[in-house]
Amino acid sequence: MPKLEMMLLVLLILPLCYIDAVGPPPPWNMEDEIIEHWQELHCHEISDLTPWILCSPEPLCGGKGCCAQEVCDCSGPVCTCPPCL
């Protein structure tokens, strides 16, 4: 087999081995993608966003239940916001 053909064969097989070793990519979840995008736009960046999901740097009444960080109560397992006026 000529060198060029051998090289092309190796280049074709190498990516298949890499994909097989890593495994298939995880399935795409649109809901997680939307939540992540919304958090990037509106919610306070902190290492663990789970309890702070409702807290925003600005008051956003009616926007996914988000409220300002100053009035957001995250003392329990979930954050609570006072009712919007």
Curated annotation (Swiss-Prot):
Q: Superkingdom of this entry's organism?
A: Eukaryota
* Reported modifications of this chain: Contains 5 disulfide bonds.
Cellular localization per UniProt: Secreted
Q: Which residues form the propeptide?
A: 22-40
In the UniProt record, the signal sequence range is 1-21
Entry annotated with the keyword Membrane:
no
One GO cellular component, as annotated: extracellular region
Q: Which UniProt keywords apply?
A: Disulfide bond, Neurotoxin, Secreted, Signal, Toxin
Indicate the segments annotated as coiled coil, or none if absent.
none
GO MF: toxin activity
Instruction: Summarize tissue expression.
Output: Expressed by the venom duct.
Q: What is its main location?
A: secreted
Per the record, the similarity remark reads:
Belongs to the conotoxin D superfamily.
Domain description from the entry?
The cysteine framework is XXVIII (C-C-C-CC-C-C-C-C-C).
Function (record text)? Probable neurotoxin.
* Annotated protein name in UniProt: Conotoxin Lt28.7
